[in-house]
């Protein structure tokens, strides 16, 4: 970055500080990961300069022959990776992929169903503060209070009562496998479309370690980062019968020109996900997450639903008298990066000061952490949580975290 260092020292310094932060902290945010050097190079390529409104072979600008080539690569690889009939790789984010899917599948004012945000859903699945809650009539479904898993029987009851035009599934904080076959059956009973948001579990689905929604869903949306380890962006998969509607909803309805440098990086990430090593990585992520869950239980912490089937765990801190906000700050000071999170059915919590925290292993596993390092990390988490606000404990843990981190290079930066 010699040019940037000279031309804009302020931005250069911020990037260097972020690089140091990445190297010297343990990232347990379930929605974060490290991209490869190849993905970073593609995202910083000359495709940044190219406007390419439209689709391959149907652009509104000249000079798009190589943009066409790279987008076709991304499309073909996405279709192959997920066994889909059609793919659109232009959405700038997962939220915009979701927006396009809504615009293609339902009309403003239609009834939709989505998982309650406080039960693990996402803002774009019907939250009142989101466009979905403002444009559509939203019926929320939730978890069973005893099992803390999706209450499919009540979901079906609500669907029969309200007859939604579309049911949305997928989550941002749900640690269990989703039963796509059951969702499809419920949709068929009420003649509803099924939209599945796999942003969190896309890598697991691609690796064959989580059931794929593609055979059951009318439309599937996702991010290209998180467990997929690509650039920050979105994409959509759908049946061929919806291809035209989806493409039109992305462009010209929702977006203008695609970010071709990001599309190129998506193509690279999809190719990386087709390699045998990617499956090995996802298996290690699941193994590490199981180890994490077991170690958290040993500390006496309560896990929502009792455990996990995927890459994340949701921890209810209410029994130990700590809230998620204070836990997030204390752990950050100790070099462990997590996020606060609401807990289903918890009382006296808000989005800013929730009752729990969400932990995930995708980034730590990409860095090379195995069960031993996860056990060590959970031990530090326990020490910090049991000594909330103790600066001496936080400083001691931070020093140990930095010492461990120096043994594990950060993908895309060190290797």
Curated annotation (Swiss-Prot):
Cited Gene3D superfamilies: Aspartate Aminotransferase, domain 1, Type I PLP-dependent aspartate aminotransferase-like (Major domain)
Name of the protein described by the UniProt record: Serine hydroxymethyltransferase
Cofactor: pyridoxal 5'-phosphate
Subcellular compartments: Cytoplasm
Keyword Transferase: yes
Biological role stated in the UniProt entry: Catalyzes the reversible interconversion of serine and glycine with tetrahydrofolate (THF) serving as the one-carbon carrier. This reaction serves as the major source of one-carbon groups required for the biosynthesis of purines, thymidylate, methionine, and other important biomolecules. Also exhibits THF-independent aldolase activity toward beta-hydroxyamino acids, producing glycine and aldehydes, via a retro-aldol mechanism.
Enzyme class of the recorded protein, top EC level: transferase
Keywords for this protein: Amino-acid biosynthesis, Cytoplasm, One-carbon metabolism, Pyridoxal phosphate, Transferase
Species whose genome carries this gene: Dehalococcoides mccartyi (strain CBDB1)
One GO term describing the cellular component: cytosol
Site (Plays an important role in substrate specificity): 225
Involved pathway(s): One-carbon metabolism; tetrahydrofolate interconversion; Amino-acid biosynthesis; glycine biosynthesis; glycine from L-serine: step 1/1
GO BP terms: glycine biosynthetic process from serine; tetrahydrofolate interconversion
Chain positions found as N6-(pyridoxal phosphate)lysine: 226
Main location: cytoplasm
Molecular function terms from GO: glycine hydroxymethyltransferase activity; pyridoxal phosphate binding
Residues annotated to bind (6S)-5,6,7,8-tetrahydrofolate: 117, 121-123
PROSITE patterns xref list: SHMT (PS00096)
Gene name of this polypeptide: glyA
Keyword Cytoplasm: yes
